[in-house]
Each structure stands twice: as structure tokens, then as C-alpha cells.
């Protein structure tokens, strides 16, 4: 095991990694911008190094500053968290070039799975189901039209790089295709520095179901059950749960087998997630692979009894997965995660940075809160709006729902608007409570908050 690691991130995920490292006896180095100098993760770490001003492109995205901080402090490895440089192959290579272990997959894997069209072709080749789509990038609007005319509308235009809903457009009417194609390319280029896009047949009213995977250097590749992330707004997840209420044991096993097939096809190492679309007939299709730890990993931890961050550290340090002998995993209980963002649902989820004048998280049986804030903390306008992740666990889904209602009612955050009230409304919605939410849930069931 490492003796010291650097955490190349901020906020909630930085603290999560540091806590896991501390339990393993590993010292931690925080990097921070001037904007984050007074945040709790900076104080929590054994050492901290300022890497630049508030703007991420002058601090958290500056590879050379992060590498220098790791070398100066004697860190042996770098954990990228999620976001920022977590899925940047050049950063993973820079770590290796400087004798630092990147706590994640190889640069080649990041590159191969980060190119969405290449990933799709790889999955097709190894027998993982995929949605009918274009062969590689679509370079012109006329090519896009030819593909759409062949498979039929609606179609989905997707960026080959990145994720989070950027560079993605649904097209239901042929007259909108050219404008949406150009808009997707423009957005993708601005967000990822790569304006490449490809097209897929749009699966209507699907569920978003993903499988958490771990793989080590000893031939162990395991699936840690699935998560249902269907409650989304503009392709951004808001609520996640595990296991999915839509899966029976046969379908769970089939998705797990497909996920392991995907992992082995690219010789993957460390933690990753295979995302699938699940249609109304129970057919599933590969969507993409996330080559990092996910925001929503705690719900998987709750139903499997694993610590995914610790497993990442073990794998990267050359140890085998500690829970490999327990595979195949059968979920026990039910967990849900609610992303508490500094956004105002009453005004179109407008960002609401500012100072938190009161922060009183819920507690009690089956309640877990992952957050880096305290009363007096300031939510910066420069970064992601995530304030906290509320995770609840129950013996079954009904208990998890009841616990979620109770915990949301107890959660007090004052000084800024948050999504707490939105989540509370979702838990009173009959469709969600019945476990029938699909990716259009917010548009069809919560339209008044859009």
C-alpha cells in the first residue's frame, strides 16, 4: 500500500478519498485554489499545496502544477476523483512519466473508452449489445441526414468526447436535424476541445442503468450489482438508487456478464462503470463507460458492503481486490442517493452560490451524508454546485423511501437555495414510488420545475 497520495480534486470527493486513505493508514496531500483555501478538505489533509487562482483552468486543470505538488511533497500516487482531470489520458500519462501512480485505469483505456464512438465499436466487436448507430464520427450534416433516414427518427446526436449531457441533442423532426447537428458540434467543441459527434437511434422512455465494476492485476473482474440513475435533468443525474427496481435476477445477471465482458475486452484495471439503456421490453444496450469513480458510488457500497475508494487504492498499489471472493454479488437491502445542489428548483434550477448560514444534516439509522461544508461555508460560483450527497439505506425499497422522506425533512440548509425541496416532492410522486421512473420522469412528472 502507498504511504502518501495526492488528491487532485476538491470538495466532497476530495474528502471522501482522504477519509478512505486515512483508514488505510495512508497520508494525504490536498491541492487547492485560492478560492478553496479555507475549505474543510484542505484542513483535513496531512499536507496542502496551493496550485493557482480560483478559475479551474488556472488551478485544478493545470497538470504541471499538480504533478509538481506531488513531487514536492513526496506523494507516490495521485487520485483524480471525478470531474476535472479524472478521465484525461494525458494527465494519466503525465503521472506515469513522473513516476507517479495514477489511481485509475491506463491512459490507453481512458482514451479508448473516452472516445464514445470508438467505445461503441469495441463493445459491438466483443458482443455487448449496442443501440443502432453510425460507424464512427459523422462529419457533415448530409451524412447525419443519410443515417437518420436509414434508421428512422428520432435520433440522438452525441459528442464522441466527454459526457454530462454536453454535445448531446435529440432530433424528432427531420427539419431540425441540421441545426441540432451544428449546435451539438459547437457545444462539444467548446466543452471538450473536440467537436466530433456520432448518431444513434434514440431509445424512447428508457431507464438509465449502470453496472459498477472493479478489475485488478490478478485476473479478478467483478460486477458490484447495478444502479438506476433514471431521474435526470438535461442528462444530469439527480437521484440514484440500487438495486434497480426494474431488474429481476436473470436480467441483473445478464447485465453483469455484459459489463465484465466489456471490462475484459479493453484489459481494464481499477474502478469503472458500464452504463446501459434499458428499454420497455427489457432489452439493454451499451451507452458508455466511465473510467473513474462515480458521484453515486455510495449507493453501491451500501448494498454490497464494499468500500470502492479503498478498493481503488488497493488495486493501484498492486494488491488484489479484497472482496473478489464474494462475487457474484447479490444486493442486500436498498439504497438511494439524493444530490443536494446549490440550485433553485423554483427558478429553473438556477445556480445559487453564497454562504451557508446554517447546515444541519440528518442522522439516525440508515442515513449517510457525504459533504465538505459546514455552517459558514461558502459555495463558490467557480465550481460544481454539489453541496452534499444524502444517502439512505433500508431493508427494502419501501423502508428506503420512508427513510429518505424523514432525512430530507430533517436536512436544514439556510443561506442558499438547494434542491432539498425538489427531492422531497419526488418522494411523494406515485410513479417514482412505484419504481417506474424513466429518463423522461422530470419532464413528464415534474414539468412545473423546468
Give the residues covered by each predicted segment.
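ATP-dependent carboxylate activation and anion-phosphoryl transfer catalytic cores
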Residues: 7-26, 48-50, 71-73, 89, ...
